Design a protein with these regions (language model features):
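Exposed alpha-helical structural elements
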Residues: 39, 156-160, 187
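Sec/Tat-exported extracytoplasmic proteins
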Residues: 29-31, 59, 66, 125-129, ...
Length: 197
């Protein structure tokens, strides 16, 4: 999994945290028409926004903006509206990873390839941090904010995204050993007897 990095402006995120305390992945969308993961990484590196996310994902790239060891400001704040917020006060900026999907075309059509790429990346994060699919939630589920709006307005779109997180991984292929989840590395090591690459 190739992840590019551009450090967020330090005024836009919080302090260091213990990554063993991560319990949730919160899915957002950027709401900007036709934007990219790189555009967002550039913007948050440059501007003082008092908000942030750990990652931005589009159909081609993943950009890390806030290191996972730091608190990103992506799901805090008060309640909005009357729906959602099932996870309010359970999921916080401190115990979650914020993932922003760049999902809208210039004509406000949902880019399905961005959603597929985001699901693949979230599934990778789930393995890395031991998070189950029930702890992958929308910003809407924390504060009631209509985010990601397409996945709030269309429950089926969210359900399809969640289904992608639990699909069998029999067809997963990895270019580099380091990208493999630990469960996949173990049989390879026992077969080789040692690092054989």
């Amino acid at each position: 999994m190739e992840i590019k990095t551009k450090a967020c402006n330090p005024t836009n995120h919080g302090k260091a945290r213990d990554i063993d305390g991560i319990q949730y992945i919160v899915v957002h969308y950027t709401s900007n028409l036709g934007d990219t993961a790189k555009n967002n990484a550039d913007y948050f590196a440059r501007e003082k926004t008092k908000g942030s996310a750990h990652y931005f994902v589009d159909e081609h790239e993943i950009w890390e903006s806030v290191p996972i060891e730091k608190v990103a400001w992506h799901c805090g704040g008060g309640l909005q509206g009357s729906g959602g917020h099932t996870f309010h006060k359970k999921c916080t900026n401190t115990n979650s990873i914020g993932v922003e999907i760049c999902m809208l075309t210039k004509n406000a059509v949902v880019r399905k390839d961005s959603i597929r790429h985001a699901a693949e990346f979230v599934r990778w994060l789930m393995r890395q941090y031991g998070i189950d699919a029930n702890h992958v939630i929308r910003h809407y589920d924390v504060t009631g904010k209509q985010c990601p709006a397409s996945m709030v307005a269309d429950q089926g779109l969210w359900d399809n995204f969640k289904a992608m997180l639990t699909q069998e991984e029999t067809e997963m292929r990895y270019k580099y050993y380091e990208d493999m989840p630990d469960w996949a590395k173990r049989p390879l090591l026992s077969w080789c007897g040692k690092a054989c690459w």
